[in-house]
Amino acid sequence: MTKPFILLVPGSFAPETIYASTIAHLRTLGFPAVALRLPTTTKRMPLPAATMAEDADVIKRSVEAVLATGQEVVVVCHSYGGTPTTQALGELGEKKGVRRVVYLSAIIPRVGESNNDAMGGKKGELAFEMTEGYMHIDATTFAPAVCNDLSWDLAYEHTLNLAHHSGASFLEPATQAGYLDIPVSYIFCEKDMVVTPEKQSGFIDVVKEATGKEVHVVKLDAGHCPNWSMPEKLGDVIAEMAGM
């Protein structure tokens, strides 16, 4: 069987480069794979900060581009990335060829909910300031919250890569729900302090209630970013899900 193309959608604040080790491992396993760059993580002065809908458009067009080559695709979305991915896959006119969506400790909004709504108006353990439409991270505080499964020095070095994210994107509601008619898997991070286990269980229930189907779940003994703490193990789990 031909292996599907894996598109990885980053979380908030996250450049595509933070998934490089996992992407490289997937390629060694024979999967074509790439992490996307979201507009909401890119400052583009004098234009305003990008919206969630703009992220969804990038995801949708990327999926369509892969499908146009005749390949099947699996979309893996991390954290905030679950919100625009849910929107993007719902907007697809043709879903044949989208083999699966994999939510990696990700937010799954109901139709009408924003990222913040889905999180109950909370932002986990994140500490940031808002300037000129962008949220900015305090890496000193952020590191132990996101990388609680790494030593503080490594966590700090990693989180220096997380610069800024559009504030507006957290407030825009989803109008589509791609999980309604695409098979769903969830990578559950048991030590996550940002999207907590309680929240992750709630998001899995959102899909169950909306579809009447069970969700395939794999648990990792990891914090919010297994792409840093266990990149190859994460790649192995994604590969397993992509082969379903």
Swiss-Prot record:
Induction record: Expression is induced on squalestatin S1-producing YMG medium.
InterPro entries: AB_hydrolase_1, AB_hydrolase_fold, Sec-Metab_Biosynth_Hydrolase
Pathway in which the depicted protein is active: Secondary metabolite biosynthesis
Signal sequence, renumbered to the chain: 1-20
Active site as annotated: 192 (charge relay system), 224 (charge relay system)
Pfam hit, one: Abhydrolase_6
Enzyme class: hydrolase
Keywords, ordered alphabetically: Glycoprotein, Hydrolase, Signal
Protein name: Probable hydrolase R7
Organism for this UniProt entry: Phoma sp. (strain ATCC 20986 / MF5453)
Gene this chain is encoded by: R7
